[in-house]
Amino acid sequence: MSLFDTINAGGAQLLGVAWPTVWALVRILVVAVVILLCVAYLILWERKLIGWMHVRLGPNRVGPAGLLQPIADVLKLLLKEVIQPTAASRWLYLIAPIMTVVPAFAVWAVIPFQAEAVLANVNAGLLYAMAISSIGVYAVILAGWASNSKYAFLGAMRAAAQMVSYEISMGFALVLVLMTAGSLNLSEIVNSQQHGFFAGHGVNFLSWNWLPLLPAFVVYFISGIAETNRHPFDVVEGESEIVAGHMIDYSGMAFALFFLAEYINMIVISALAATLFLGGWDAPFEFLSFIPGIFWLVLKVFALLSVFIWVRATFPRFRYDQIMRLGWKVFLPVTVIWVVVVGFWMMSPLNIWVK
């Protein structure tokens, strides 16, 4: 019996019919706290990694090796005043930051950490993740409009166009995963990647979706960078043009909530990419399968997040027209063509996804 089963059985005996509700709340709280800690130290890792790329040390003053820097940053933001522009729409202005964070947290309900370790193992998990993650664009538009600022509204309009443009390509990439796995359940998608010729010979990583669906994987990940408005797709903020985009009139914790949502969405994109294309909790080689699955998932997510940071430190910002051209004239045709190719592939004698 696993640790979770032991806790579940003991709690059921102690609290009776109230236990399922209490257990669900405890799991949600644990996941939320872990995500917040991950965001705090992801920001530190980003600053450290970019510092090393610049031949600098990065943050190293607060605590040993700078490990307490995230706590200092949080305290600083908590103590700052939330200043509201006089011309802003009060309630919409305050609701917008909350609306960005809530969908980012909600997606984690369906992401499996390892076999049988998921908050809600729903059959339409992939559809749920896509639907919930697309809600964030409304909060960005709301923030730009409620601030009653031309700069903020311009940033919000850019964000809306950019996010909608790349969601279409991401959607087609996920259709390919649905076609090959035959399920919208994220746990079943991971299980579908554990079969095949290479998996049968102990080389699991060659059976994952990244290899046969490589164009979709590349499109999904780059579109994820654009969806989170990260460099080189950060024309929404565009420091040299419109300063901070839709966040220009926010301060204190209201400002911090936008960045919290951005970094949570980075982790979500990486976790979904690892789940859909990199085998989720599956070990790369069969002889390593004794290591808990959550270790492999965390390792894959960490690697993808490091790519996010590497891209930020390496590439210059694209012009707005270049971003639109990439989404509509490159990524969309590539994913549509690959859907057709995989469809014919699955109907041919060379079908590698036969269960």
Swiss-Prot record:
GO terms for cellular component: plasma membrane. Pfam families: NADHdh. It is an enzyme of class 7 (translocase). Its main location: membrane. It is a multi-pass membrane protein. It catalyses: a quinone + NADH + 5 H(+)(in) = a quinol + NAD(+) + 4 H(+)(out). Its EC number is 7.1.1.-. GO terms for biological process: aerobic respiration. It comes from the Bacteria. Belongs to the complex I subunit 1 family. NDH-1 is composed of 14 different subunits. Subunits NuoA, H, J, K, L, M, N constitute the membrane sector of the complex. NDH-1 shuttles electrons from NADH, via FMN and iron-sulfur (Fe-S) centers, to quinones in the respiratory chain. The immediate electron acceptor for the enzyme in this species is believed to be ubiquinone. Couples the redox reaction to proton translocation (for every two electrons transferred, four hydrogen ions are translocated across the cytoplasmic membrane), and thus conserves the redox energy in a proton gradient. This subunit may bind ubiquinone. This is NADH-quinone oxidoreductase subunit H. The gene is nuoH.
